[in-house]
Amino acid sequence: MKLSRRSFMKANAVAAAAAAAGLSVPGVARAVVGQQEAIKWDKAPCRFCGTGCGVLVGTQQGRVVACQGDPDAPVNRGLNCIKGYFLPKIMYGKDRLTQPMLRMKDGSYHKDGEFTPVSWEQAFDVMEEKFKTSLKEKGPEAIGMFGSGQWTIWEGYAAAKLFKAGFRSNNIDPNARHCMASAVVGFMRTFGMDEPMGCYDDIEQADAFVLWGSNMAEMHPILWSRITNRRLSDPNVKVAVLSTFQHRSFELADNGIVFTPQSDLVILNYIANYIIQNNAVNQDFFTKHVNLRKGATDIGYGLRPTHPLEKAAKNPGSDASEPMSFDEYKAFVAEYTLDKTAEMTGVPKDQLEQLAQLYADPNKRVISYWTMGFNQHTRGVWANNLVYNLHLLTGKISQPGCGPFSLTGQPSACGTAREVGTFSHRLPADMVVTNEKHRDICEKHWQIPAGTIPAKVGLHAVAQDRALKDGKLNVYWVMCNNNMQAGPNINEDRMPGWRDPRNFIIVSDPYPTVSALSADLILPTAMWVEKEGAYGNAERRTQFWRQQIKAPGEAKSDLWQLVQFSRRFKTEEVWPEALLAQKPELRGKTLYDVLFATPAVSKFPLSELKEDQLNDESRELGFYLQKGLFEEYAWFGRGHGHDLAPFDDYHNARGLRWPVVEGKETQWRYSEGNDPYVKAGEGYKFYGKPDGKAVIFALPFEPAAESPDNEYDLWLSTGRVLEHWHTGSMTRRVLELHRAFPEAVVFIHPLDAKARDLRRGDKVKVSSRRGEVISIVETRGRNRPPQGLVYMPFFDAAQLVNNLTLDATDPLSKETDFKKCAVKLAKV
């Protein structure tokens, strides 16, 4: 086969990415231009992380047979990470589910029965009976849903609409609660609006990069390649990496900092103190655009109210704050001296000063990146607020190459979980259920009776587990996630709750995951390009793709499942008489009629599409469902700083970053000349706040919920590895990725291993106060913990690491701290 220069470069990019992971390259990736005449190519965003890389998908005879980086995609510019190159294989695991499976005994449903194939009609019959019984006997608070940052935009929107407007239950929450909730609350507290103000274009213009609890080399490798290129192209560019253990991102670091768990709060306040003491505050920016507030402290750990830590907290769950002066703030951070910070964090003084100087230097453009190290933290919201403080003190924000940037881990944690409003407290476009005006806006736009949407915040992820255990939540639908493996403290609440005979659990999934096998009913689900979809990535880029192949067997998209199930309920069965009296014309109609077949949603005909562009749902319903849902949803944000472009624009583009006003996307929000919502002469305007000013919060160090002691003498931190994504339900079914990292290990310092008579490769029992797992000792390799800490990835279903973790959460965001609990090791 003769290759062009461009194809040759592409093939070598694939080989380089594979070599970095120690893998062989699949033939479909290696043969970049082979048999192009027989393969149909179309664009799609990658199925994995929140970077939002663009890929070209090659289909042939109804299957995905090839994949390559999209050279026209601005995010990745033709390059994929190793997971991206193996995308063609994620849908073809030998155990792919192709028909509904119900636990049955003697021909009918039984909690302890064996999984038995049933039709969709039978599956929905059982679901309908369980939903209607719970709604009739206990009301909307007895049903719930756990969704996903992997839902497409219209799937998340349909789910939120069905539960909040249809079933009148706010007990819907996404798995983004476990990864991005602290970022959401941090953004809302400081700026009054969610999501980053900058974009990936900052990378090529920055002078310094600071990673806070983020191993971008493995978790966001395409962005890391751009940072690496920037660092190696200019000797004046600096990289600082902060973590509780060394990892691959340290290889590029000019200043690699390992700190004691939880003490990142101390470092952040020290830097603020350094900026003030060295007269590095941007006084003009600060005076015009910033307010100061002192936050409530001693706020607890999001545990059950009966837990001793919650009983001891003075202000459990409080997000209160009060105004303070600059002198008061200066005095507050003055306590975080260099000596005190070095002592509390274990970080050498020269490294701390070097880090602080990056932020304080007025001539250095600095980007702060963070992911789970900040967010999965019992003070994760505070950590987010404190890093914003540094950028607001110095004015290094909302300009090219400058700004704080929260990275996401799922492909649409931003576009779906956050923007659509699938959290238990949120509605579309940053609106919330507790705000009467916001509820009224939604009810009028959806043309449903006033008062339909409950004002009470629903159950968040961990609260759902507890309610299942307590028998208060009785019907639970889990979609597009594997929470039985991914969620914290499996044995305490979740597993007992799922297997409680009072409860009925539905899991929609393509594979028999730990969650699916723990359920009562499994619904087979279409994946990725087996459906038409849309994701929103970490830089506010909304990206669309067409359905390119059909799902196997009877597998159906999450959207199909939600919409078709809504047909089973008439308004009289879910709404009280007082609501129906407001709109008697809705009597006798199904939730499908009221929510999904409305004139607003169903007005786009199939004639807008070519035959080969039709998707299964629209073909079945007779109208362009996805376009109708998107346009209805997009209305909420237009004119309010969340503007999305018209639907058709996205199919013709490689994504657009909102707000999109008059056809132009926005790279940098809140700054004049970049953001259409900032008028000439305003300079900066943080328009999420009534006065247009961002907030600096004074927040102290507070200890972790659980720390090592004489018995459980090691910190445990959990996370991911390059080759696998989350629980491995897709990547472990790709033979090459599985071979590259076949089982989880315990990364441990050699001296800690020696003290316990452990050697590399030994089997070891890892125990916490909540459970235990058997794993393998690893004293070398990519992750190098300090003494006193071990690190374990959670992708391995044979090693349920979350048997060990504590379900302590940030009291403000309700996000779990997966990075800090106490364990002990014993040789097996």
Swiss-Prot record:
Cite the 4Fe-4S Mo/W bis-MGD-type domain residue spans from the record. Answer: 39-95
- Can you tell me which residues bind Mo-bis(molybdopterin guanine dinucleotide)? 83, 150, 175, 179, 212-219, 243-247, 262-264, 372, 376, 482, 508-509, 531, 558, 718-727, 802, 819
Q: PROSITE patterns in the record, alphabetically?
A: 4FE4S_MOW_BIS_MGD (PS51669), MOLYBDOPTERIN_PROK_1 (PS00551), TAT (PS51318)
**EC class of the enzyme, as a word:** oxidoreductase
Q: Which Gene Ontology cellular component annotation is one that this UniProt entry carries?
A: membrane
Which key words tag this protein in UniProt?
A: 4Fe-4S, Electron transport, Iron, Iron-sulfur, Metal-binding, Molybdenum, Nitrate assimilation, Oxidoreductase, Periplasm, Signal, Transport
Q: Which Pfam families match?
A: Molybdop_Fe4S4 (PF04879), Molybdopterin (PF00384), Molydop_binding (PF01568)
Cofactors needed by this protein, per the record, are:
[4Fe-4S] cluster; Mo-bis(molybdopterin guanine dinucleotide)
EC number(s): the record gives: 1.9.6.1
Compartment annotation: Periplasm
Q: Which InterPro entries match?
A: Asp_de-COase-like_dom_sf, CT_Nitrate-R-NapA-like, MoPterin_dinucl-bd_dom, Mopterin_OxRdtase, Mopterin_OxRdtase_4Fe-4S_dom, MopterinOxRdtase_cofactor_BS, Periplasm_NO3_reductase_lsu, Prok_molybdopt-oxidoreductase
GO aspect biological process, one term:
nitrate assimilation
Q: How is the cofactor bound?
A: Binds 1 [4Fe-4S] cluster.
Please name the GO terms that the record assigns under molecular function.
Answer: 4 iron, 4 sulfur cluster binding; electron transfer activity; iron ion binding; molybdenum ion binding; molybdopterin cofactor binding; nitrate reductase (cytochrome) activity
Check the record and name the SMART domains matching this protein.
Molybdop_Fe4S4 (SM00926)
Q: What's the subunit arrangement here?
A: Component of the periplasmic nitrate reductase NapAB complex composed of NapA and NapB.
The family classification in the record reads: Belongs to the prokaryotic molybdopterin-containing oxidoreductase family. NasA/NapA/NarB subfamily.
This molecule's function is given as: Catalytic subunit of the periplasmic nitrate reductase complex NapAB. Receives electrons from NapB and catalyzes the reduction of nitrate to nitrite.
Full protein name: Periplasmic nitrate reductase
